[in-house]
Amino acid sequence: WDQNLTDGTAPSPYTYGIECDSAMIADGLCPSTDDYELNYSHGTGVAGIAASSGLAANRYRGVAPNADLILVSMNFETDFNTTITDAIAYIYERANTLGKPCVINTSVGLYDGSHDGTDLTAQLIDALITEQNGRALVAAAGNAGSFPFHVGYDVTATEQFTWFKKLSYAGVAYF
């Protein structure tokens, strides 16, 4: 789903952007833009790290080379809280239709929100994740340089600290 383009059909129930399936993309039937701001390839790199099959140059493989991908090109020019929530709902719905579990990587480069899960967008996203089993959402960390947007915790010499903890009963980790 490209949330930025208008020359096509928006996915139901949304009223903006265009939706192209893999066959349309392979056949070159999806509209595109030459706008550098919309096509700077960050998503391509992230998708490669996540799911590259290793068939391209240098045979680099992603962490989940057999994964199916559902991609959304975000619209950052309008209400980001709406477009990110719509994107997450869209991806989970498509994965549900395919009968697949789903992990969403939200490396969108923004640091909006309350950072404590109390804002409405965070609550909506949490509700989408917990609506059914087999859903997870991860966010990029560390791209902010010296800006104060990092997860942090002061650890004393006498204190035990766990950054990641594996839930043995669920096969997942959290921090």
Question: At which residue positions do the language-model features occur?
Answer:
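Subtilisin-like serine protease catalytic core
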Residues: 1-82, 99, 132
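Substrate-binding/access-modulating region of protease and related hydrolase catalytic domains
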Residues: 74-174
